[in-house]
From Swiss-Prot:
Family to which the UniProt record says this protein belongs: Belongs to the UbiA prenyltransferase family.
Highest taxon, organism lineage: Bacteria
Required cofactor names: Mg(2+)
Function as written in the Swiss-Prot or TrEMBL entry: Catalyzes the prenylation of para-hydroxybenzoate (PHB) with an all-trans polyprenyl group. Mediates the second step in the final reaction sequence of ubiquinone-8 (UQ-8) biosynthesis, which is the condensation of the polyisoprenoid side chain with PHB, generating the first membrane-bound Q intermediate 3-octaprenyl-4-hydroxybenzoate.
Source organism of this protein record: Paraburkholderia xenovorans (strain LB400)
Catalytic activity of the protein: all-trans-octaprenyl diphosphate + 4-hydroxybenzoate = 4-hydroxy-3-(all-trans-octaprenyl)benzoate + diphosphate
Protein name: 4-hydroxybenzoate octaprenyltransferase
Pathway membership: Cofactor biosynthesis; ubiquinone biosynthesis
Membrane topology value: Multi-pass membrane protein
Keyword Cell inner membrane appears in the UniProt entry: yes
GO biological process, one term: ubiquinone biosynthetic process
One Pfam family matching this protein: UbiA
Record InterPro entries: HB_polyprenyltransferase-like, Prenyltransferase, UbiA_prenyltransferase, UbiA_prenylTrfase_CS, UbiA_sf
Entry keyword Ubl conjugation: no
């Protein structure tokens, strides 16, 4: 068992934390806004650890679902299931165990949060299969990656206001932006194996579509900032996030594989900048 631990860690991408961070930033945004900048330490621990656990479970299910495709993609041909080092049932069992651990974490929380966790589990588990029939599966991914937003509001306020769903919508557009950059890396392989991605759906308009999605995301956060009366520190964070989006354009405009991958990874800074602006605004109100 312990000898196989490195394989399991590779399966759930513990060596690639970017995915967990892309889930965590919008969840932290929601925790801070829902609590007026004062989330409790237990909630921070629950949502942070839960985010990592569910992202790990999602990776295991994704590799199980894509096991017959990954062998034909340069970037994924050596993943543990595809290479035969881990059996398919092991990935499913690991995903189930991680999901159970995540559910145990939220047992102290209210009933609404638990109910939303069931919906979150369904969306996360079904996402990998949408690549077979949905033209823009990245939009579905945005719902899966953003479900921590309504759950955070539910845990703190015991209801989910419209603001939470607006923030989730922003996350959908952001996810389409960064995961289209990711899909541009595998475009040629995805054409051969016949799966659907936003990079293929957008075609020659892929760069324009990505920048439009960034614009919508940032535009929604303009509305949030105005609605909540955020101050200068928030707008500095917003401006830094907008700068990141502009920088991504310089990386993806020529559609070079590694530059597109670099743009995808750099979204950690975009998400971090938005959160820093939100956290800084609330911190300034304490004094």
């Amino acid at each position: 068992m312990f000898a196989r631990l490195p394989l399991y860690l590779r399966l759930v991408r513990m060596d690639k934390p970017i995915g967990s961070l892309l889930l965590l930033w919008p969840t932290l945004n929601a925790l801070w806004i829902a609590s007026d900048g004062r989330p409790s330490l237990p909630l921070l621990v629950i949502f942070t650890v839960g985010t990592v656990l569910m992202r790990s479970a999602g990776c295991a299910i994704n590799d199980y679902a894509d096991r017959d495709f990954d062998r034909y993609v340069r970037r994924t041909e050596n993943r543990p299931i595809t290479s035969g080092k881990i059996r398919a049932w092991e990935a499913v069992a690991l995903a189930a165990a991680l999901s159970l651990l995540a559910f145990l974490l939220i047992l102290p929380l209210n009933a609404l949060t638990k109910e939303l966790s069931v919906a979150a589990l369904f969306v996360a588990g079904s996402y990998p299969f949408t690549k077979r029939f949905f033209a823009i599966p990245q939009a579905y991914l945005g719902i899966a990656f953003g479900f921590g937003i309504p759950m955070a509001f539910a845990a703190i306020q015991n209801h989910v206001p419209m603001l939470a769903w607006v923030m989730l919508l922003a996350n959908v557009f952001w996810s389409v932006a960064y995961d289209t950059e990711y899909a541009m890396v595998d475009r040629d392989d995805d054409i051969k194996i016949g799966i659907r991605t936003s990079a293929l759906t957008f075609g020659r308009f892929d760069v324009a579509a990505i920048m439009l999605c960034y614009a919508v995301t940032l535009g929604i956060y303009v509305g949030i900032g105005v609605l909540l009366g955020f101050g200068a520190l928030y707008w500095l964070g917003w401006a830094a996030a907008a700068g990141c989006a502009i920088y991504h354009y310089t990386l993806i405009r020529n559609r070079e594989r590694m530059a597109c991958f670099a743009a995808f990874r750099h979204n950690n800074w975009l998400g971090g900048a938005l959160f820093a602006g939100i956290a800084a605004h609330y911190a300034a109100t304490w004094f």
